[in-house]
Amino acid sequence: MTAPIVVKIGGRALDEAASRGPLWNALASLAREHAGGVVIVHGGGAAVDAHLVRLGMFTARAEGLRITPPEQMDEVAAVLAGRVNTLLVGLLLAAGVNAVGLRLGDAGAARCDLHRRAGTDLGRVGEVIGGEGGAWRALLRAGCTPVLSSIGFDERGSALNVNADDAAAAVARILRAHALVLLTDVPGVRGQDGGTIVELDAARAESLIDAGVITGGMIPKARAAVATAEATGVPTVIASWDAPEHLRNLAHDAPVGTRFTAGARSAPRVSLASDGHG
């Protein structure tokens, strides 16, 4: 079976989901044209923040991860696996995608445990520690597109809040994906001539940072993409949700955004998180 493409959606693409028709249509085309199908992993940090504010609950973060006290876990799961997942599945169905909404840990496809970080109590924040992805593979074989919220379960069956970027990387690793696509507000890394750089590895990315070509907010994005490619063994693509018509190029191995590959030298290991879950 051809390996699937894993697409992570978050940020403004979700905050303005109802007005993103071209994006959902492009994902429908990609799912039809790529023989291995597509798996979508989504965040929803802004929706969680707004919900917790309405409830008078405080949100704290540590190094990009949303600290999730046990008393907030049900609320976080209700928003991510309920409201956001339902909205996204509906929009994809309307675009012609055979979308099936799931939590990350459903059917044991991904095994999770509490996230271990020395000196910081993250509450019910989880991380993926293994899995076979059997349920996702079965759905892909049936012509369906799994749409995964980043809610996992520990060995006792209690819910865990997994960072969406980390969840997408884990899904790509488990499925040995053809590519992992991180949809952002930028089309990729710009070169000195203003054009998008097609491919980078750790060494070249760092040399462009040192030369002042990669600057500002693109520095953590580039380092995170390289780190993900090296950790998963899966090429990682930064592409824009504002140019979704190019996404179908992935089905034909044509350039889209900037593709990051594992190189001989590792970039600094930086969390993919930008807003906790978006």
Show which residues each predicted segment covers.
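C-terminal catalytic "cap/lid" subdomain
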Residues: 1-278
